[in-house]
């Protein structure tokens, strides 16, 4: 009897650096590459049309690349637990390979499939290639707990074994005599479906700003590295108006779907740095967003409640407001703040926004202005953001809402001043909010302050053609900072964490506390690897390296009822606080 192998694609939609597929092919007589698509999931899940289109383009590209090797992709409708027992029998399978999935849901799913495979006498090959490191080894090195500060994570990574080189690309030489049994009705049975077949209405759908697939990913990688001439001086390009637009060298959606190997990216960066710096070893910060990606994956891998506040041992329990109307205005770009609305419009139209734009809208929704739970924002990003990834999306939202990882809650983005500093002329606003196109730069970020005559000339009356601001930012941000301060003071008393820093008393700009200048070193929000093309860097928040465990296990009840009153804590309470150290480091 021959050796019949199946490789199951999930993420990792590529033929380069695919060690599980490469090992599966070795010694096999036949190989079939499958992708399992649940049609019910397509119609009911919280995933928008742009993300589905990107995925289908990835599958089409993968199929096209397999065709060049006299093989094909088998897209199978159904659920894995139902599909595999049938395939094992029908195709007489003896070997199954998968890329290791570190997320709790993926681990549970894969354990069930491995059990079915064992019962059917099928060998299972699992290899790590979606992350740079074996996350379990990082946790083991840290005494069995995930590191919860980036500084600690860097320390652990520096002690790890050197990374393995990327696996050879699957070519006809690698496949050798291994064949793929194909039938004449392959397209009918196993073809990649269209958006329409999945039930999506594509009328009025604009062309993709981010085309999916490995071919596009590798082209972008080469362009990205060509732009990395700044590596010579180890400097980052400054953020400007153009940074806000989708870049032809952006990589984050490709890393999220595994069209691009993070290992290949890592080693290409390393080679470039060594070439420029005459073989000196690159600092960890060169790999900025790749390491933030690993950090969040590590934090999430053993925590099935990572995307929830309640029951999540690393998440501060904050009594957020429930306000569906305000949430809808934010999600649909109807807040009355052009900077926020333009960002949310770009997100809905294109499926991507710059990482600092993510910070701005996340802060506005949560601790900055609306005091709505980060879980609600995370769900909107999950629907709309091409690079939304369970671990990174949840981790970034906890981080940006000061619910975990980061406690400098007095750093608040101003929804007027931040945009104005980034794009003084307002071209970004005009592009995504054409209704405001007629406003001069002086008023385009706060059009409600424009005299009525200017509004008439612009053919846009505030409150009629464009909404008035939904909130007074100066008042809301001040109140919310006080709310956060009280929550963290209670934390400090209950747990002795000493996480508070002194709160500046005078907000600048339009009442917002500008915590970060555009282009500062901060991790991306909600992204699979962030926007690597922008050279985004790192801001390290080190509270020492002691482990932060169960920040507020007591939950909501322990915090009393006065937390939203805005009452300023006493000077004695202020004196008990300990300010976190902020460490800057050059970015990648």
Curated annotation (Swiss-Prot):
A motif (LIR 4) lies at residues 255-260. GO terms for cellular component: cytoplasm; mitochondrion; nucleus. A motif (LIR 11) lies at residues 430-435. Belongs to the DNA photolyase class-1 family. A motif (LIR 7) lies at residues 335-339. It comes from the Eukaryota. Residues 545-568 have a biased composition (Polar residues). It comes from Rattus norvegicus (Rat). There is a cross-link at residues 11, 107, 159, 329, 485, 567 (Glycyl lysine isopeptide (Lys-Gly) (interchain with G-Cter in ubiquitin)). The modification Phosphoserine is found at residues 71, 247, 280, 570. This is Cryptochrome-1. Binds 1 FAD per subunit. Only a minority of the protein molecules contain bound FAD. Contrary to the situation in photolyases, the FAD is bound in a shallow, surface-exposed pocket. Binds 1 5,10-methenyltetrahydrofolate (MTHF) non-covalently per subunit. A motif (LIR 8) lies at residues 379-384. The keyword S-adenosyl-L-methionine does not apply. A motif (LIR 13) lies at residues 492-497. Induction: Expression is regulated by light and circadian rhythms. Peak expression in the suprachiasma nucleus (SCN) and eye at the day/night transition (CT12). Phosphorylation on Ser-247 by MAPK is important for the inhibition of CLOCK-BMAL1-mediated transcriptional activity. Phosphorylation by CSNK1E requires interaction with PER1 or PER2. Phosphorylation at Ser-71 and Ser-280 by AMPK decreases protein stability. Phosphorylation at Ser-570 exhibits a robust circadian rhythm with a peak at CT8, increases protein stability, prevents SCF(FBXL3)-mediated degradation and is antagonized by interaction with PRKDC. Its cofactor is FAD; (6R)-5,10-methylene-5,6,7,8-tetrahydrofolate. Component of the circadian core oscillator, which includes the CRY proteins, CLOCK or NPAS2, BMAL1 or BMAL2, CSNK1D and/or CSNK1E, TIMELESS, and the PER proteins. Interacts directly with TIMELESS. Interacts directly with PER1, PER2 and PER3; interaction with PER2 inhibits its ubiquitination and vice versa. Interacts with FBXL21. Interacts with FBXL3. Interacts with CLOCK-BMAL1 independently of PER2 and DNA. Interacts with HDAC1, HDAC2 and SIN3B. Interacts with nuclear receptors AR, NR1D1, NR3C1/GR, RORA and RORC; the interaction with at least NR3C1/GR is ligand dependent.
